[in-house]
Design a protein with these regions (language model features):
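Anion-binding alpha/beta catalytic cores of soluble intermediary-metabolism enzymes, centered on
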Residues: 1-297
Length: 297
């Protein structure tokens, strides 16, 4: 696994540009990152949105659009569907969310994923870099599924492990987060964790190591955890847990987060609306590396 986002960015610069559909780039940070991503050789952008509006934003931001292709589409859902169709057809390697509600993009991704494979489901992978931890780790799924059942968790885990395999993490360590009750009995989440561990032992997910522990306290050694023992993937039981965990890492531990949402090999970058130019540049680099590794584009 990559040790930090600088390493991922360096890898992106080696790979060369990929065609990316930028969904509703009518925001200063989005259009600036798009232009710089093109300059750095990360992407060849296709801007999808209301042409008059995004052109005005680019002009106000001092960003020349030059030869960037623009597809004029005012309806947000139609625009999101169009972007995913481009990836399905091979006309783009990935989609980048701009100034639009994530819901539209998730709907389009779920639709496209089901068209390609009825037994897969999209999920969000949040890649985290934290000071003092010499590797990037993933939390899933804090974005798409509100409270996934066991079958859905299998699909989420399959997705996450496939992505990490493609990034060179040949035997990812997984922790399925759950809690024990005070009386010693197990919750539904703990039962799911045990079932997933058994499936992992049986080879259901390919090469991986699903930890029997269901929280970090169980693997502490004198108050600390070695990088080797720290999971590469944390599978959360529901969307609330995922959001709390991701935001806590961001704001309490001073972490850096980059999110991608993946389903049936379709890749969308889902930065937060509050993310600035530098974070979005890192997100483009991650998208390029994941697309090159997972899709072989």
């Amino acid at each position: 696994m990559h040790k930090d986002f600088d390493e991922i960015t360096a890898r992106a610069k080696e790979l060369g540009p990929k065609r990316a559909a930028i969904l509703f780039p009518d925001d200063a940070h989005v259009i600036q990152a798009t232009a710089e991503g093109m300059k750095e050789g990360f992407i060849t952008p296709v801007l999808v949105g209301e042409k008059e509006h995004l052109t005005a934003v680019a002009r106000k931001s001092g960003v020349p659009l030059g030869t960037m292709e623009i597809i004029d589409q005012k309806d947000p859902q139609e625009a999101a569907n169009l972007c995913l169709d481009m990836v399905v057809k091979g006309d783009a390697s990935f989609v980048v969310k701009g100034n639009i509600l994530t819901t539209y993009l998730y709907r389009a991704l779920i639709r496209a994923t089901r068209q390609l494979s009825t037994d897969q489901t999209p999920c969000t992978l949040c890649f985290h870099q934290v000071p003092g931890i010499n590797k990037v780790f993933v939390i899933t799924d804090p974005g798409v599924h509100i409270c996934p059942d066991l079958n859905c968790k299998q699909k989420i885990l399959t997705n996450a492990i496939q992505v990490l395999h493609s990034l060179g993490c040949v035997n990812p360590r997984v922790m399925v987060l759950a809690t024990r009750r005070f009386d010693g009995s197990s919750s539904t989440f703990a039962h799911d964790a045990e079932k997933l561990r058994r499936l992992g032992d049986e080879g259901k997910f390919g090469r991986c190591k699903i930890d029997p522990a269901t929280n970090l306290f169980e693997i502490l050694d004198r108050g600390s955890i070695s990088v080797e023992r720290l999971p590469d993937i944390f599978l959360v039981p529901n969307i609330e847990t995922g959001n709390i965990l991701c935001k806590s890492i961001d704001h309490i531990l001073g972490g850096i987060r980059q999110c991608v949402t993946v389903g049936a090999g379709l890749i969308t970058l889902t930065p937060s609306r509050s993310d600035g130019y530098e974070v979005r540049m890192g997100n483009l680099a991650l998208g390029l590396v994941v697309a090159s590794s997972l899709r072989g584009d």
